[in-house]
A protein has these predicted regions:
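Glycine/proline-rich, positively charged
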Residues: 1-103, 107-108, 114-120, 127-128, ...
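Structured C-terminal cap/extension of enzyme domains
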Residues: 59-61, 89-209
Length: 209
């Protein structure tokens, strides 16, 4: 059972959606009764809510938390958008408490499979036989605390590429991680509009839809 969109609208939205109406207490009881096997939440937005819910882990015993994690957001999420939180912090906080992570946006809304030509050349020079996207999927899947990595697949080629990447998964080495972090630093030199096409900001009050 996933509590979706935690953090959007801040603490007030979380309390109105899940606490004041008794929904969270109900779900905790349902899990205790065995009718819900796993209970967790997906985090979007306000870090205060994320930190609060993790501080309640002893009480709620979260079975998983879904976070946005990729090699660009690892250290640059806040740089891209001040409302974001770096994935390094999010994953680290889950690890401290032994909470498994489900990874969303491993390709950052497709941006990590559609990168600048200089970045494509850099990745291809290193591993000519690998797709650009596979680097991001290997990064997301290499962390020991990751339960699963979500992938939005439009075409059969996407599925086949994912199967090549994960069956079996070759976790990144420390040197490969450094290579990707350097790649992320280079990507930040080519600024783009920080849009994941998630449409969470729509309808836009300024009409930019």
């Amino acid at each position: 059972m996933l509590l979706h969109g935690i953090g959007m609208g801040g603490m007030e939205a979380y309390e109105n959606r899940y606490v004041k109406n008794g929904i969270l207490d109900f779900l905790l009881e349902e899990r205790k009764a065995g009718r819900i096997r796993n209970l967790g939440f997906s985090y979007h937005g306000d870090i205060e809510v994320f930190d609060y819910l993790l501080s309640k882990h002893d009480e709620y015993q979260w079975d998983f938390v879904q976070i946005q994690l990729n090699y660009l957001d690892w250290k640059h999420a806040k740089e891209i958008n001040p409302r974001n939180t770096d994935a390094e912090y999010l994953y680290g906080e889950l690890q401290k408490r032994g909470i498994p992570a489900i990874i969303m946006e491993p390709l950052l809304g497709g941006r990590l499979s559609n990168v600048h030509d200089h970045i494509v050349a850099r990745l291809k020079q290193r591993e000519p036989g690998r797709s650009v996207a596979s680097w991001a999927f290997r990064f997301a899947g290499s962390f020991p605390g990751v339960l699963t990595v979500l992938s939005g697949m439009t075409y059969m080629e996407h599925l086949q590429d994912n199967l090549r990447t994960y069956c079996p998964l070759q976790p990144l080495t420390e040197e490969e991680n450094r290579f990707l972090f350097d790649t992320a630093d280079l990507m930040m030199q080519y600024p783009t509009i920080p849009c994941n096409d998630c449409k969470y900001c729509m309808p836009c009050p300024y009409g930019i839809d």
